[in-house]
């Protein structure tokens, strides 16, 4: 056999030139035990709290939550059935982060930001940590711009502003999600404009809900053209507790992208009671000490650190906003339970929905007496302030009188008038689902009710009166609605035109 030294030396030179002197160091650990979505891992001495770790054999990821002397408690994001005792666990050296940006609009993703709608990969250029600090005091500004829901009873009586946190609370099947969907649909005209400062991007976080419910919601948004400016994050009932715990923070990180870039976003957490239950499950399995109702001691902090991230930013910080509408489900109308009282104390007000009102046919079933907005009329346009102040007073007096009227046999004329007006205003605030009203139409309809033009109309015809009045006004005097929309107030000449129009319509209504 002939030995060719030149050829051999050439091969050796190439080998030496391409030799990689860098060593790839991976810090690994071993699974001690696994079950119920929690893995105990030995090793990983330098792992960070909240760091993503990988289980290469099982193809799933997890997050390090409990850092103890001799082991690390890891919550598993996915199915833990493929994880075995003794499996290798590797550090990723990054805290849990998710894709953010406009590429997510119109998409349905899971709690880690992975697409689950079958529309291909997400086009996102930026990633953000799911857990970040809320803005401080200096970067914030008081809430002053209205966030129109399109629901008369809310926009008039419990106004919500951009950057506010308003709790939607009520028993199951009282129309909580219906109000949310109406609010999303109502943003369509604003999002059709080119002005970024007026647009409101919508984010819906479904925690612990049925998959069929989420699919139906997405279909409704698509049918009404609202999905193109919305993001849906789904951690459904069949997913492990860590995913349900993480989903609200994921949604919040996506919303903060809009807030920090001078845009406006609305985020809905539906619902935080299920997130608290998922967190309780994780905490108990991690052997953290239980507190009241077996919730861990930091369940208040779980929600406060999430909701504090919703804010209206000052002009120096881009003037963006993130508005939060957390949802809480009560048991038998008990708003004084542990989780409801926690979230009520964190938020800037609550919209309380009642089963009794729902079954009476008052829908949306908002209990105006128990609902409040701590931002108040600062979040209303001037036109709404002009008409809504009176309706609050009238309804409060009506509720008080209605309670006494049950026991009184003969009532004086003024009381009868007050009861008749109250019944008509209650009827006026009813609204069909998926039919949000523009603010100028709401103003006209409340103006008509508070000025007494409905006093002679039979209660069962109030809905017809309102619908016909608005359609007649659009056809014959659209300038009245245009004036209210553009000026954001009812000017003297507009009011005169409005009164004349309503009077002539009322006389011809039959």
Curated annotation (Swiss-Prot):
GO terms for cellular component: plasma membrane; proton-transporting ATP synthase complex. It is a peripheral membrane protein. ATP binds at residues 170-177. Its main location: membrane. The record marks 371 as: Required for activity. Its EC number is 7.1.2.2. Keywords: ATP synthesis, ATP-binding, Cell inner membrane, Cell membrane, CF(1), Hydrogen ion transport, Ion transport, Membrane, Nucleotide-binding, Translocase, Transport. It comes from the Bacteria. Belongs to the ATPase alpha/beta chains family. PANTHER family: ATP SYNTHASE SUBUNIT ALPHA, MITOCHONDRIAL. This is ATP synthase subunit alpha. It comes from Acidiphilium cryptum (strain JF-5). The gene is atpA.
């Amino acid at each position: 056999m002939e030995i060719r030294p030149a050829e051999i030396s050439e091969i050796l030179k190439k080998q030496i030139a391409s030799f990689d002197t860098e060593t790839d160091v991976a810090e690994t650990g071993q699974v001690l035990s696994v079950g119920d979505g929690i893995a105990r891992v030995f090793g990983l001495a330098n792992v960070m709290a909240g760091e993503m770790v990988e289980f290469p054999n099982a193809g799933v990821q997890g997050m390090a939550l409990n850092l103890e002397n001799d082991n690390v408690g890891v919550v598993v994001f996915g199915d833990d059935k493929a994880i075995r005792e003794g499996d290798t666990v590797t550090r990723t050296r990054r805290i849990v982060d998710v894709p953010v940006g406009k590429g997510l609009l119109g998409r349905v993703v899971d709690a880690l930001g992975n697409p689950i709608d079958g529309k291909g990969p997400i086009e996102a250029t930026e990633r953000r940590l799911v857990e970040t600090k809320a803005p401080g005091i200096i970067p914030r500004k008081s809430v002053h711009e209205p966030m129109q829901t399109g629901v008369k009873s809310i926009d008039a009586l419990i106004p919500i502003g951009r950057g506010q946190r308003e709790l939607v609370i009520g028993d199951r099947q009282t129309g909580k999600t219906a109000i949310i969907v109406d609010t999303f649909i109502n943003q369509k005209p604003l999002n059709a404009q080119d002005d970024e400062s007026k647009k409101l991007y919508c984010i819906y976080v479904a925690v612990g809900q049925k998959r069929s419910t989420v699919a139906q919601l997405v279909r409704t948004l698509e049918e009404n053209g609202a999905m193109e400016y919305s993001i849906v994050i789904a951690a459904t009932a069949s997913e492990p507790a860590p995913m349900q715990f993480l989903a609200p923070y994921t949604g919040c990180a996506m919303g903060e992208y809009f807030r920090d870039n001078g845009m406006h976003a609305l985020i809905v957490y539906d619902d935080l009671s299920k997130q608290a239950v998922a967190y309780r499950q994780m905490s108990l399995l991690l052997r953290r000490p239980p507190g009241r109702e077996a919730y861990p001691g930091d369940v208040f902090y779980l929600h406060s650190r999430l909701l504090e991230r919703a804010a209206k930013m000052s002009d120096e910080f881009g003037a963006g906003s993130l508005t939060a509408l957390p949802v809480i489900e009560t048991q038998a109308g008990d708003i004084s339970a542990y989780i409801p009282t926690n979230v009520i104390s964190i938020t800037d007000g609550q919209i309380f929905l009642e089963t009794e009102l729902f079954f009476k046919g008052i829908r949306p079933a908002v209990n105006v007496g128990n609902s409040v907005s701590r931002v108040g009329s600062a979040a209303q346009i001037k036109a709404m302030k002009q008409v809504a102040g009176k309706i609050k007073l009238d309804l409060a007096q009506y509720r008080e009188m209605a309670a006494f009227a049950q026991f009184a046999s003969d009532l004086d004329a003024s009381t009868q008038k007050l009861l008749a007006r109250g019944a008509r205003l209650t009827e006026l605030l009813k609204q069909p689902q998926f039919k949000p009203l523009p603010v100028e139409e709401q103003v006209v309809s409340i103006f008509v009710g508070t000025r007494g033009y409905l006093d002679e109309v039979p209660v069962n015809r109030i809905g017809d009166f309102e619908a016909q009045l608005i359609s007649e006004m659009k056809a014959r005097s659209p300038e009245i609605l245009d004036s209210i929309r553009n000026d954001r107030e009812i000017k003297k000449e507009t009011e005169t035109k409005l009164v004349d129009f309503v009077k002539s319509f009322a006389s011809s209504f039959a």
